[in-house]
Amino acid sequence: MHRARSEHGTRGPVWLFDLDNTLHRASHAIFPRINRAMTAYIVEKLGVAHDEANLMRASYTERYGAVLLGLIRHHAIDPHEFLAQVHELPPLADVLRAERGIARLVAGLPGRKILLTNAPAHYAMPILEALGIRRHFERCVSIEDMADRRAWRAKPDATMLRRLLVREGLAPARTWLVEDTRSHLKHLRHFGIKTVWITGHLPIRNSLGKVMPRSGRPHYVDIKVQSLRELRASLATGEGAKRVARAARQSNPN
């Protein structure tokens, strides 16, 4: 787990940020590259046809939150080998896309920031560096950090989040999960945390051609925004500001 000094101490909200399609547009070029690498890995290791491997990759992502967990459970693959092979990054200047002024937007959010990603550290940290936002994150929790003695874990695993909240001393009422993946928001909101659904980086269709939902605001989403800029604006005025203030009062009743 990578740590940096907190910029805001222990007061105020705590933001648990997803990485891909939340802080940058992974669907532009990085996700297609990773998806191809994952499918090729499955073809090579399991000896299945390309189409079957592609369906397996998508199915495990939907069922377990990460392809890795399905491959471990059903095929006993080497997790470290898998993560190393399928998360090789090209030159980031060629593929990285993010909001203009993202460093200023992240820095301007009140409270602590923790990265919570199902990606490995050797992938996540260079992206944070390239975006110029690594120093704004007090913790960077990768999929390796989510594992325990019993099993590898990934969002939306309940045991993983429960241990993270305890380890970091986070009050659920003032903890906000910022995600593009609705299923993660839905499952983890049961802990009493608040949820932000960010939709601006979502592709129109997923890798199998299915339309990605982005309309409406499900009951388990507290704030829906298209961008970090919109999130900042909603926290300055309006309903977003009221929700953050209400969460702070709930966690500090005195």
Map each language-model feature to its residues.
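Asp-based, Mg2+/Mn2+-dependent phosphohydrolase catalytic module
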Residues: 1-10, 107, 121, 125-254
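N-terminal helical cap/lid subdomain that shapes the substrate entry/recognition surface
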Residues: 7-17, 22-101, 107-108, 122
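Short, flexible active-site loop motifs that bind/organize anionic cofactors or intermediates
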Residues: 43, 72, 92, 114, ...
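Proline-centered loop/turn at the N-terminus of a beta-strand
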Residues: 112-114, 194
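Conserved phosphate-coupling serine/threonine residues in phosphotransfer and NTP-handling enzymes
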Residues: 117-119
